[in-house]
Design a protein with these regions (language model features):
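Adenosine ribonucleotide-centric catalytic and binding domains
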Residues: 27-51
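Intrinsically disordered, low-complexity segments enriched in glycine/proline and serine/threonine
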Residues: 9, 42-44, 90
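Generic ordered-secondary-structure signal
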Residues: 24-31, 36, 86-90, 102-104
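Alpha-helical interaction segments
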Residues: 21, 38, 78-81
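Short, extreme N-terminal segment that most often corresponds to the first beta-strand
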Residues: 1-35
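Intrinsically disordered, low-complexity regions of eukaryotic proteins
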Residues: 6, 15, 37, 75, ...
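Low-complexity intrinsically disordered segments
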Residues: 46-133
């Protein structure tokens, strides 16, 4: 999901809110048929946001670039995130290029795994894997 950061401001949890609360604000709902755990998909998203200054775009532009850059044969777009059966849901909070954050929710456990800037995701979760730059 890509959601403008302003939509989290009315919640005391901020970016840690349950993603279903802002699913109607998401520019894109993308399902990628592979493991979504933070050590893989979290780091992939962080690497992508930092590459080529991708994180500096508004939500609509960021979403279209995300789909373009991350698309592969087992990638699907859905009209709503609640139609996707997945363990981890990531929200990229757009709207301020200097303060971009990503939240990760474990949908099976119904808990927020993290809310971090891309650099912190990499420093916390990077492992010895064959990531895409």
């Amino acid at each position: 999901m890509v959601v403008d950061r302003k939509h989290s401001s009315k919640y005391p949890e901020g970016f840690a809110i349950h993603p279903d609360l802002v699913r109607d604000k998401s520019y894109v709902n993308m399902y990628m048929h592979h493991d979504g755990y933070p050590q893989w998909q979290g780091v992939q998203i962080a690497n992508w946001l930092l590459a080529g200054n991708n994180g500096c775009m508004d939500g609509a532009r960021l979403s279209s670039k995300l789909v373009h850059d991350m698309y592969y044969d087992s990638c699907y777009l859905y009209p709503s995130a609640d139609k996707i059966d997945h363990e981890y849901r990531y929200v990229i909070w757009s709207g301020d290029k200097d303060k971009i954050h990503v939240s990760c929710w474990n949908m099976y456990k119904n808990e927020c795994v993290f809310v971090l800037k891309p650099e912190k995701i990499i420093s916390k979760y990077h492992d010895d894997m064959d990531y895409t730059d």
